Amino acid sequence: MKLSHLDEKNHPKMVDVGDKNITSRIATASGMIYMSQEAFDVIKNNTAKKGPVLQTAIIAAIMGAKKTSEIIPMCHPLMLSKVETDIMEFVKECAFKLIVTVKCEGKTGVEMEALSGVSIGLLTIYDMIKAIDKSMRITDIVLESKEGGKSGKFVRS
């Protein structure tokens, strides 16, 4: 399989999407963060010294999706039409699951924007609570689904 981000001399390049059709693109990614009971309670009770953790993580996830092309070298800048987030609590596991869905009308997909949003959102939780629990674990950052473009639809099974 030939990688599209490498030229004939094996040098990195940004893929030319100029001839592609503009289509509706949507992608959803998710990830988990596990923590101590104390850290989980601080977040749930909204008593973190740095402020409202989950609300800040949502804003960070949106910013992370929007800034993807600035931090991942071969990503194209995209005009996003939607970034939607959801956070699920897992009380028994002392964990949160962050889900980010990104949409645009464009010539390339938004998978990296969804994955970046999840990553930055979870890193923000870690940053805001690390004084309480440095052993937090960020895991299972995955693409859940994507639609649009030549490669069609993908849904994680």
Swiss-Prot record:
Disulfide bonds: none annotated. Pfam families: MoaC (PF01967). It catalyses: (8S)-3',8-cyclo-7,8-dihydroguanosine 5'-triphosphate = cyclic pyranopterin phosphate + diphosphate. PANTHER family: MOLYBDENUM COFACTOR BIOSYNTHESIS PROTEIN 1, MOLYBDOPTERIN COFACTOR SYNTHESIS PROTEIN A. This is Cyclic pyranopterin monophosphate synthase. One of its GO terms (molecular function) is cyclic pyranopterin monophosphate synthase activity. Substrate binds at M74, C75, H76, M112, E113. It comes from Campylobacter jejuni subsp. jejuni serotype O:23/36 (strain 81-176).
